[in-house]
Each structure stands twice: as C-alpha cells, then as structure tokens.
Amino acid sequence: KLGLLNSTIEAQRNLFLDTPPGEEVRKIFIVPVTLNYHFVLEAPDLIDEYLSAKGQDRYLPEQDKYGSWQLIQFLFKFFTKGSNISVSIGNGLDVIGNYVDDHGNSLDAQGRIIDTRDYFVSNGDITVDKQREDEYTRILSQKIVSEYHRINRIFASHMVAFVAFEMWQKKHPKLDLFGLLRLPEEDQVIQYEEFRKTCKRVRKQIYALKEQGKVYHATHLKGNIDLVIRHGLDNVGIFHLKRPLLMNKEGNIITKDFNTL
C-alpha cells in the first residue's frame, strides 16, 4: 500500500513545517509486524482464483467443492482442532526506513544518531518535494519488506509443504505448473526416507539463514527430524477439507490437494 505509506512521509514533513520553533516535533514511527500461522483458511479459494486467471483454458477448476457433507466436516474440524499463531514484531523505523533506538532517535548505517528533519530540507528550509518523497516511500517500503523477511517465523508446516512441492517439481522438470497439478495419483507419492533427508538439508539451511539474521523459525523446528516432520504434517492445512500433505499407510508422503499445496 504505497499510497498509504506515502501519507506517513507527508505527515512527518507537515509536522516539521507546522511545529513552532523551539517546540519538540512529534515523530512518526513504523513498526513491522508479521502474523505467522500454519495455514491460510481461505487459501484454496485464493489459489483457485489465481490458477483460473493464469491458466485460463489450461486449468479446470473443481466443481461443487462445498456440499452439505463438506460443510459438516469443516465445522467438526473447526470446533475440535486447534492451531498456533505467533506474532513477530520487528525493529522500529522512522519514515525514511532508518532504525531507531529505544529513545526514538534515528540511526544511520553506522549506528550514529541523525536528524530526520534533514531529509526534508532544501536550501535551508523544509520544502514539499513530491518526487523526493516518492523516492523515500520506495526506500521505506523496501526496508519494511526486508524486515518482514527477517522477522518471519518459519513453522514445520511451512517447511514440509515447501520440501514436498519442490521435490515433485524436480521429479518432473519437463512439466509446467499446470501439468504438475494434473499428475496422476500414483505419481503423487514421495518415499519417506528421501523426504526426510531433504527436510534435514532444508532445515540446516534455515538455521544458517537465521544465523545471518535473514529469517527466524519456531522453536518446534528444532529436535528430532521425524517429530518435526510429524508436527508439520499434523498442522499443514489442518482445517481444509482435503489435506494438502499427509502420510499414507505405507508411511510415505502424499497429497490429497495438489492445488492447495
């Protein structure tokens, strides 16, 4: 929402313009926040809309997905199962995208205190410069997105879903997305040992990204990999009518809803 974001920069500039000399200028802060959860309840419908628009005649949506029995199934799951949500709060920013300290002072890349007012000064005066403020909006938006990535919390459900889909893609490199979604049921199986090894490798990369400060992960991602995988499978698409990922009787990984996966 760049237009909404731009309004914070305009407001900060107006505060500098309207505050009488000698008075403290109120400062506007941006605090990135992410909500992290195992699945998106409306994902099947959102994905269906996207695939219909992108695939057109290459995509045939499923008809009559929600009958009376499906509604009863959903309500039963909704009232008998639970799922976790975590809230991640990032570092505070000023309207230019600089980090701020505990006292609200803006900091440059070297951690030195800087005056945000200087960003709005031209020839010694506070000025209105639309082009300049559009550039500030772009910088601020990029900083917020990078903070979203940094504080985003990876769950086991995210990992198992990512690994499974990537493995199916690599098994069928000649198929595009819509060809992949039409895979016959007998090809929608991943051997558990192969899946387990890939999950361990991906988890190791997640740990490395966390050490670099690029991402975060839930505490349940640590520990025995089989328990982590089980936790992920138990929670991915927990309320959806068709589970996007689960384990079959032979102990291998399958999907009942490739589209949602």
Model-derived regions, located:
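Membrane-interfacial terminal anchoring regions of lipid-handling membrane enzymes
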Residues: 1-261
